[in-house]
């Protein structure tokens, strides 16, 4: 077969023109060492801080230390398959997690992968876990209440939508119980909840999920679980992943609530990662940026204005404000609130609910110390009826605690002091509440009205809770319209107050409890 030279050149030209030369340019590095989930990598010259790195066998990591000769990275997930000499590639992406309404009702890990055995989550959107908090101009003041359904909190330490309220106390004082009751209380109120479990036993997380399912709360709740068996990196990043999932709803003009349970364990995990990365330790061996660790997380909880939401959604959502309310939990050691992490978080948040072991052991549950629990912005968000009725409660309690200390030594008390002590005992008893039974606004209003107006002064202390329950049943049966008005308007008009007074007096005459 004879080939013409001109044909050869034409053939080569057509082949070259038809060649698709697409290249995937990515920097590669080599693993130098692997210890406790921390890898040192040589050769990643253009890696970003916080960038996702791809290891062999579909394992991912995050670059945290950018040094002159090497990169310190944490491996997300199982690091046992990573060994010296492995090739590592940059991805050009910051760590992202899936977001959206599809996550509701599911239990996911730090990376947003389903771990509840209900199959994959069909979400199309992702977002980065580390985001800048909304600026000063984008925010609105806190003015709408977030009902926890807990008598002691809604009356004395009210929480508003967009607030950061710390729950602090020793182990086994009911911190998680307060948070879970608050989530259950959001049923039917249009609030999406995110529960982030950090460093807890898998069985404990399972119990919380089961309780949320029993009370129908999982349908509006996302659970992000970083169990004690997960790596330190997964535990420290779980809070940011959960926050991103909550921000999805805030930025679209909806209300969300996020619980971090707890930030003490997150600080421990971050300390472990930092020490393994050979960052210099400071007070209590924490790294120098442990304050920033929590401040950049909690500042993302905010109430944003209509302009922010409209701009974020490109005009799709107009005239709606969004909010993300945070309930961080801190565990103290022997009531020491002046330790490093507790003082940091107290200074960042808008108030704290302090739970005491002594009160818990004395049967006062929830074990809230009203004297040192405060809400710095929630007062502006309190419902009108509760604000009107709860004024005397805090004073009664404070005076009772003060007098009770002196009354131990005094044998002869005057009538005014004795009355004050008796009133205080009844207030303490009334504020007790079983777990998983959050109250509606009208129920709290009725209880506060009864104690403030002296209707409980002649009721035996042991019968207070039975009296309260029977009174509510009486009102449900005979004054349904009244309690519906209080629930709908969140106010107590003069006519309603007169009807309520008559109803309580009628119940006291004929009621059995």
Swiss-Prot record:
Any idea which positions bind ATP?
Answer: 169-176
Main localization of the protein described in the UniProt heading: membrane
As for membrane topology, the entry says: Peripheral membrane protein
| Reaction(s) the record says it catalyses | ATP + H2O + 4 H(+)(in) = ADP + phosphate + 5 H(+)(out)
Q: Which domain of life is it from?
A: Bacteria
Per the UniProt record, the site (Required for activity) maps to 373
Q: Specify one Pfam family.
A: ATP-synt_ab_N
Alphabetized Gene3D superfamilies for the sequence = 2.40.30.20, ATP synthase alpha/beta chain, C-terminal domain, P-loop containing nucleotide triphosphate hydrolases
Quaternary structure, per UniProt, is: F-type ATPases have 2 components, CF(1) - the catalytic core - and CF(0) - the membrane proton channel. CF(1) has five subunits: alpha(3), beta(3), gamma(1), delta(1), epsilon(1). CF(0) has three main subunits: a(1), b(2) and c(9-12). The alpha and beta chains form an alternating ring which encloses part of the gamma chain. CF(1) is attached to CF(0) by a central stalk formed by the gamma and epsilon chains, while a peripheral stalk is formed by the delta and b chains.
User: What name does this protein carry?
Assistant: ATP synthase subunit alpha
Source organism phylogeny: Bacteria, Pseudomonadati, Pseudomonadota, Betaproteobacteria, Burkholderiales
